[in-house]
Amino acid sequence: MILRFRSKHGMQRVNCEGSEQFGTVLDRWVKLVHERAPREAMEVGVAERQIETRIAAEMAQKTVEQLGLKHGDMLSVSFKETGGSLAVAAAPERSSELAVDRELAREEGLIRRSHSRLCRHGDRGMCEYCSPLPPWDRGYQQEQNLKHISFHAHVKELNEHTNKKASGSTYIPPLSPPDFHVNKHCPAPHEPWPRGICSKCQPSAISLQQQEFRMVDHVEFQHSELVNEFINTWRSTGMQRFGYLYGRYARYDNTPLGIKAVVEAIWEPEQHDEQDGLTMDTVAVRVSVAAVDAIAADMGLMRLGMIFTDLTDSGSGDGSVFCKRHKDSFFLSSLEVITAARHQLHHRNACRFSDQGFYSSKFVTCVVSGNLQGEIDVAAYQVSTDAEALVDADIISGSTHPSMAYINEPSAERYVPEIFYMRRNEYGITIKENAKPAFPVDYLIVSLTHGFPVAADTPPTFQAHTGFPWANRQAMGQSQDYLELRRVLLPSIAAGDYTELHRRLSSFHLLLYLHSLQILDASEWRRLVTVATTPAPRGVEAVYDLISGPGWQTLVMILQEAA
């Protein structure tokens, strides 16, 4: 049978069976029109039979027949508004937004200034020379040598122009993710692409420029041992290594309304390392990563980004490495930019200020390579919203020149708009250059700062980053098994040293291995996570609850028998 869908995208026909779930049919239509609104925001009804409209999410689990739909029915699909007649301050809340986003959205982020010698008033007065600056102030940005303003400062700057506080009119989301797809369901009276096209369905010409804001301002590794242990793989084997970063997002006070990614752990998926790269079974890795994500969520952590090495020993015998990445070569290669964009597309950032309910991503990319002094250093990046849209529309691909991205040729499935970028010529004049057939990937890169905690305001989630082997390091002669578990845990258990036991249990990789053994039941697992993620002395006190459980007693008995 055929169902017809009528919406702001025009009318489309979708083939289906009466026994199919309506959610499956709806997904087929969503894919046709490239609609990104969630089911909760869609209202579906059959206008010709005066059936009351219902939320699509409520209809998804029922079959087409159960909903009383027949061959040829016309379904009208509308979308709920994201805001009402409210003032600017009342932007619609999103339950999936991160806590740090909700916190920063409520703040003004004004930059306080002290009295200057130009002030002519008392201590309680204020003038143009000492009044607070908005968080997007370009003068402050240059003074502090900030390459990018924070995301929330960017949003507030857009809101200042899009939604006037005094007007009290309907809230207009100031953000809209760029979309470079051609609309194959254009309502204009012409055949769809590639047989026809018009100004309504084709994306506009793209002018690439450095993105002014960044979704994350800083990457903070909670302990230097994290990075050092990750690099040890290269030191031991000479092979490159890849890992995922786990942690949380927090506010970053060195930038107005800034956000930092706090890295608590690094997890390395199954991989085959080589001297100039690595290979992975993407299907197997996807399954493993999903399992680790779920366990990390129990610990209050999430996947923040990825990290990989690009190291080559200089041969001088002093531990120095070659500097491959600099302003005259590249910072991220075109393939790495595309990989980062795909990861960012997979990790959307929920955002109340976007008309789609999401905007860009907080997923970060860290590279461990040599700096200009020949030292091993970390560099942190993201890619721009334009990079995400170019990759999503399959417009760019990697090239043999790592600093250049190749623009794909148009096809029946791919429309390639005009792409330009601005550069300075040999006379110092800014000119617009046609990007075809390739353009510098630097236009797609957003650089972040990185470092380690300056003050221990927030204690790290884990106390031990070494001792118990990291996962998937069999090629290095390291494996996770009962013997290693016995070596790490049994001495402190036998001695009754619960302070040391607490420290050794506070290990991300040890927790992952204990979870894989399936010895502890759900309640004991929660107690173990509480012990591992709670700092002393409360974490030590929680050990007493853990060791009284039958699952823990079974584990101790197994370790005592392990030989």
Curated annotation (Swiss-Prot):
It holds the Pfam family zf-NPL4. GO terms for biological process: mRNA transport; protein transport; ubiquitin-dependent protein catabolic process. Involved in the import of nuclear-targeted proteins into the nucleus and the export of poly(A) RNA out of the nucleus. Has a role in the endoplasmic reticulum-associated degradation (ERAD) pathway. Keywords: Cytoplasm, Endoplasmic reticulum, Membrane, mRNA transport, Nucleus, Protein transport, Translocation, Transport. The keyword Membrane applies. Gene3D superfamilies: Phosphatidylinositol 3-kinase Catalytic Subunit, Chain A, domain 1 (3.10.20.90). It is a peripheral membrane protein. GO terms for molecular function: ubiquitin binding; ubiquitin protein ligase binding. Belongs to the NPL4 family. One of its GO terms (cellular component) is endoplasmic reticulum membrane. The lineage of its organism: Eukaryota, Fungi, Dikarya, Ascomycota, Saccharomycotina. InterPro entries: MPN, Npl4, NPL4_C, Npl4_Ub-like_dom, NPL4_Zn-bd_put. The keyword Kinase does not apply. It is found in: Cytoplasm, Perinuclear region; Endoplasmic reticulum membrane; Nucleus membrane. This is Nuclear protein localization protein 4. CDD domains: MPN_NPL4. Residues 219-359 form the MPN domain.
